[in-house]
Amino acid sequence: AYIDDFFRTETPTNPVNYNLVWSDEFDGSGAVNSTNWYHQTKLPSGGSWHNGEIQHYTNRQVNSYISNGILNIIAKKETFTDQGKTKQYTSARLNSKFAFKYGRVEVRAKLPTGVGTWPAIWMLGQNILESGGYWSSTHGTASWPACGEIDIMEHWGSNQNYVQSAMHTPSSFGGTVNRGGQNISTASSQCQIYGIEWSAEKMIFSVDNVVHYVYNPAVKNASTWPFNAPQYLLLNIAIEPSISSNFTQGAMEIDYVRVYQENALSVHNSTKNETIFLFPNPAINQLNIKVSDDFIGSQAKIYSILGQELATHILDSQQNTFDISTYQNGFYLVKIKTLKGIKTYKFLKN
């Protein structure tokens, strides 16, 4: 079953309860960071992308670039020949070079407009056999949909104010019954945070923390739940044959992509007698540093990610709170001097 027009009362877990394990903040301007992303451009057999899509995906900067801290994925109307095929539209399809199992994903994005545009923020099993995909040559063992597909956000220009989430598994795929969505009147005029929480039990989909779909099959097996293995992220705009003749180009603008996990790569360091804990992470206006008695009196220095020292604090109690409201958004380092040396931690200011 699926839900379309009502909301679950379930609420996503506050990301403060998670640790940030991977992100791209798309700082600066220029090319997409190739350490984080792979441009998938190889056409499937048959010479066209699935679902009747009519675009070429390219690795050119005109189709994907960073400008003033925003990733722009651009679908364009232009004649372009690649792999022996000439098409009239181009776009970009990015695969993350990071795969993970379970956690919370947040993507802050503004969507394109126009009938025939099909932007998506989604995930595929790292084990997918897909010629041209980033992970296929090293991890590919399963075809689609046995690998599992998680659509965090899909949007069709023909239904401008509606966004959808969906699941594709061997039990239901393509026109899957496992889907739900909500109306977002500002989907193309303002950024929204598209989120999913993925655990061993269920998937919770939301926009700006308003839940619109929960996938929690009563029976979990390879047919209904191929989701106990790592998945990776994809960002793209597809073009449908129904694209308007007046279309010239459209952009999906992405402010950030963040992946959080519980108890993984934590900013928590603990031995039998020593504890240092930074929270929340990400932080907004205040950073808390909780320490065991061993560290009371120690210095905590905050540095920019480039190594510039910004502040020095004394940890004068077990619970210490420091004002970071004047810091710009981004990553920072905290170095704490102890008898055993210097311990370094990273946090994100939002």
Model-derived segments and spans:
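GH16 jelly-roll
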Residues: 1-264
